[in-house]
UniProtKB/Swiss-Prot annotation:
Name of the protein: S-adenosylmethionine:tRNA ribosyltransferase-isomerase
Role of this protein: Transfers and isomerizes the ribose moiety from AdoMet to the 7-aminomethyl group of 7-deazaguanine (preQ1-tRNA) to give epoxyqueuosine (oQ-tRNA).
Principal subcellular localization: cytoplasm
UniProt GO MF annotations: S-adenosylmethionine:tRNA ribosyltransferase-isomerase activity
NCBIfam families to which the protein is assigned, alphabetical: PRK00147.1 (NF001140), queA (TIGR00113)
Domain of life: Bacteria
UniProt keyword Cytoplasm, yes or no: yes
Subcellular location: Cytoplasm
Organism: Roseobacter denitrificans (strain ATCC 33942 / OCh 114)
């Protein structure tokens, strides 16, 4: 299985840099096996059945991009350097691993000042990343970070425009609850409260799980033999209540439909033994063609990058040829791609 098998040509103008407004006006490609239909997200209730269960990732994206100044007293007088920081993940002590640019301009124990309220001290450097200790914690840290930080937009958006205040709402789901992600579970960005209410009124059920999406989600696959690729790890949690709800849906013969690849990867991690159980920890599950799905019956997801692990995941679910047809159709019909783009509802043909 070669990396080039998952490549395709994508016109630059199909890469979305802003979301559809309103959220539910985004287009929705519905694929039932080899049958493809064009719809819109607001019509999602018409494609689902009473008793279907949507599994939603309730992680909250933090404004992880910070710009600050390193101050240093020298023989020539006070000097400062502009420092850019992207927070990656916290450790058990509350310190943050971070990408620091330029890292060489900050010494161990030096302080970076981001605002009147927020500053951090460099405590260590490991594998090219800094370890930062902030002056605040808990709600105080969250408030100061929200004021000083910018949303960590994906590279394919950030290279086209800077993040702004709109992104603080656009790049956050309406049900975001547990802070810790540095990338959004983007399929969930299409939902608003009215759509959630309409789905519930139609008998669609919901379960919430948490997977803190990390910056590693944007890392390219660098090996030609995809089976040798090593996935990045991300922290996730499936509660006992969510596991029981999902199992009840399976036992009732109804469909479990994760919204987004993060929710899918998490429930398949928790369901490796055939039945989903309460689970918490770091998952590095890598789903590619040949994978046996134990939990997910379908998937709602956006359109993914060529040669990405997510292209491999949807190919595992739907079939390689089916995904080629889906993406050919999406390009021909000018669907918008990636995080702020349109959505797809993928329903595999079961034997």
């Amino acid at each position: 299985m070669k990396l080039s098998d998952f490549d395709f040509d994508l016109p630059e103008d199909l890469i979305a840099t802003r979301p559809a407004v309103p959220r539910t006006s985004a287009r929705l490609l519905v694929a039932k096996g080899r049958q493809i239909s064009d719809s819109i997200v607001s019509d999602l209730p018409n494609w689902l059945s009473p008793g279907d269960r949507l599994v939603l990732n309730d992680t909250r994206v933090i404004p992880a991009r910070l710009t600050g100044a390193r101050h240093r007293d020298t023989a020539q007088g006070p000097m400062q350097a502009r420092i850019e920081v992207t927070l990656l993940e916290p450790d058990a002590q509350g310190n943050w691993s971070a990408l620091i640019k330029p890292l060489k301009k900050v010494k161990i124990a030096e302080e970076i000042i981001f605002s009147d309220r927020l500053r951090a001290t460099l405590r260590a450097v490991k594998d090219g990343q800094g370890v930062l200790q902030f002056n605040l914690e808990g709600d105080d840290f969250d408030a100061a970070l929200n004021a000083a930080g910018a949303m960590p937009l994906p590279p394919y958006i950030a290279t086209r425009r800077p993040a702004d205040e709109r992104d603080k709402s656009d790049y956050q789901t309406v049900f975001a609850q547990n802070s810790g992600a540095v990338a959004a579970p983007t399929a969930s960005l299409h939902f608003d409260k009215a759509l959630l209410s309409e789905l519930a009124a139609r008998g669609v059920l919901f379960s919430y799980v948490t997977l803190h999406v990390g910056a590693g989600t944007f890392l390219p696959v660098k090996v030609e033999d995809v089976t040798t690729h090593k996935m990045h790890a991300e922290w996730g949690q499936v509660s006992a209540a969510a596991a029981a709800e999902i199992n009840a849906t399976k036992q009732a013969g109804k469909r479990v439909i994760p919204v987004g690849t993060t929710a899918l990867r998490l429930i398949e991690t928790a369901g490796r033994e055939g039945q989903i159980k309460a689970w918490e920890g770091d998952t590095d599950i890598f789903i590619y063609p040949g994978f046996r799905f134990n939990v997910a019956d379908a998937l709602m997801t956006n359109f993914h990058l060529p040669k990405s692990t997510l292209m491999m995941l949807v190919s595992a679910l739907m079939g390689y040829d089916e995904v080629r047809a889906i993406y050919d159709h999406a390009v021909a019909e000018k669907y918008r791609f990636f995080s702020y783009g349109d959505a797809s509802l993928l329903i595999p043909q079961r034997d």
